[in-house]
Regions:
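Metal-ion/cofactor- or nucleotide/acyl-coenzyme-handling active-site neighborhoods
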Residues: 2-320
Length: 320
């Protein structure tokens, strides 16, 4: 299987000519763009404009034969020397160059190469008059299936999804993207609680700052080597269980933008073949609690961003 993330990072070392995206918007003249993610569920190409799909997403092709379908694949997946491969558009070369440029610009904001989905959204937000996003929330699960070999990493683990949602949150007001918003309660958490034995449940946080516990997890540098110590492993598992069951109002009470950004590094490894992963990313039991924690962190960023945007809107209204 191609190591697409390794392939992508090679492009950070290469020289790239910079495109004027404003001029490119005039050249391509996108009026309506629909971006279809790889989440589950049926979908059809948009009836107007251009539809973007990823890595050959399947659809009933004869249902809308007259519409333009553009496929974007990352270079590693497509076994190409380029960072992206664009098929189905007459200006595929320009789109490939623009996607690469945006991805390189996003990388330092994320600490890793961005997903093709976020890269396309950020680019199209600058190139198209109207952008709709479907079957995508930038929140794939880090819960490892029981049949995944212990030495294999989840493909989605190489991206900083909390960081991607942080960047996308600022674009949401200008996009048609109903699936992006998170509910305050992470519903899968309820079934996880029901399945747990009483002796497995760590003490819940009532008044303490959950970010302090995340900081302890970060300071412990809990790599695979440390997992050889059963006591350390069990202690950190209990931390994860505690955090996964912490009520959202407690998270919101202590959430600060800088803290939220600092926690992002706990939940991805952009180079798992050469850089050891935090043990809980590779552990079937521990990984079951990561989505609930990430959901709380992402929801905190969502509410803080919404509140900030509302304050700015009120200031502008009062000043006019």
């Amino acid at each position: 299987m191609p190591k697409s993330h390794t392939h992508m990072h090679q492009h950070l070392q290469m020289p790239h000519a910079k495109l004027d995206l404003q001029a490119l918007a005039g050249t391509l003249a996108f009026e309506q763009v629909t971006i279809i993610g790889n989440a589950s569920g049926d979908w059809q190409p948009a009836t107007t404009g251009t539809t973007f799909i990823f890595n050959g997403t399947q659809w009933a092709e004869n249902s809308n034969a007259n519409n333009q379908i553009v496929n974007i694949a990352n270079g590693g997946f497509a076994e190409s020397k380029y960072a992206f491969v664009v098929q189905g558009h007459p200006q595929s070369g320009l789109l490939t160059q623009a996607l690469t440029q945006v991805a390189i610009e996003l990388t330092p904001q994320l600490g890793c190469w961005p997903s093709s989905g976020l890269t396309t959204i950020v680019l199209m937000q600058q190139l198209s008059q109207h952008v709709q996003v479907q079957r995508m929330s930038l929140f794939p699960s880090l819960s490892r299936p029981s049949d995944l070999p212990l030495e294999d990493h989840l493909p989605c683990m190489v991206h900083n999804w909390l960081g991607e949602r942080r960047i996308a949150q600022a674009l949401v007001p200008s996009l048609d993207w109903p699936e992006f918003s998170l509910a305050s309660v992470f519903l899968p958490r309820l079934s996880a609680i029901n399945q747990m034995q009483p002796c497995q449940v760590a003490p819940r946080i009532n008044a303490d700052n959950p970010f302090d516990l995340l900081e302890r997890l970060q300071e412990s540098n809990s790599l695979i080597a440390d997992a050889l110590n059963p006591a350390t492993r069990q202690m950190q598992l209990e931390w994860l269980i505690t955090l996964a069951h912490t009520p959202i109002n407690i998270w919101q009470q202590f959430a600060h933008p800088s803290q939220l950004i600092n926690t992002e590094a706990l939940f991805f490894n952009h180079m798992p073949e050469s850089k050891p992963s935090n043990w809980y990313l590779m552990d079937t039991q521990a990984s079951q609690y990561l989505d609930a924690i990430r959901h709380s962190l992402a929801y905190c960023w969502q509410t803080l961003s919404t509140k900030h945007a509302s304050l700015i809107g009120n200031e502008l209204s009062n000043g006019s």
